[in-house]
């Protein structure tokens, strides 16, 4: 199976802080599959490191109040094209990201408060019918499958 994965989850230093969100469970799950790593934010031309951003009233804005929506949406569109070109069947994305958040994102106040919602790229994938998983929920999903309760 072809699996698209947020590049930061695989250890690529593309996170806004300059680091990564390496996730062993994601790497273990992806082993034996064709992995397509992407970082929509980098694809959109944003530097690493960069100012943190959140979705504020539907627009991606960084902590300094600068509108970075165009960069986020352009990067998401490029990442979506990569997913389509590769025939991706599943995406595993970084939790709470304004690009990749699957079930919840930060509320736009830069206070750490989470709300239900999707990041720009996650929503694009879902709208295209790609199955999307939140990396933070992957261990629970694996356990359910092992217990035969899925």
Where do the language-model regions lie?
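Short amphipathic alpha-helices and their capping/turn segments at secondary-structure boundaries
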Residues: 22-35, 75-90
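Short, active-site-adjacent cap segments at secondary-structure transitions
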Residues: 45-46, 98-101, 140
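N-terminal glycine-rich phosphate/adenylate-binding segment common to multiple enzyme folds
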Residues: 78-109
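Short, well-ordered beta-to-alpha junction loops that form the rim of enzyme active sites
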Residues: 8, 94-97, 137
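Short, surface-exposed acidic-centric catalytic microdomains
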Residues: 21-62
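Short N-terminal binding/cap micro-motifs at the start of the first secondary-structure element
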Residues: 11-18
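Divalent-metal-activated hydrolytic enzyme cores
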Residues: 43, 52-55, 59-78, 82, ...
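Extreme N-terminal starter segment of soluble prokaryotic enzymes
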Residues: 1-4
């Amino acid at each position: 199976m072809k699996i698209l994965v947020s590049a930061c989850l695989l250890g690529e230093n593309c996170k806004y802080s300059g680091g990564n969100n390496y996730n062993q469970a994601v790497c273990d799950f992806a082993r034996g599959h064709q992995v397509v790593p992407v970082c929509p934010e980098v694809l959109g031309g944003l530097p690493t490191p960069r100012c943190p951003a959140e979705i504020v009233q539907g627009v991606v804005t960084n902590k300094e109040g600068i509108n970075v929506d165009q960069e986020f949406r352009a990067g998401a569109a490029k990442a979506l094209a990569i997913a389509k070109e590769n025939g991706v069947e599943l995406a595993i994305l970084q939790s709470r990201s304004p690009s990749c958040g699957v079930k919840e994102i930060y509320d736009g106040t830069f206070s750490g408060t989470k709300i239900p919602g999707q990041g720009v790229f996650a929503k694009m994938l879902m709208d295209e019918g790609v199955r999307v998983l939140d990396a933070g929920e992957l261990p629970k999903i694996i356990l359910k499958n092992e217990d035969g309760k899925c």
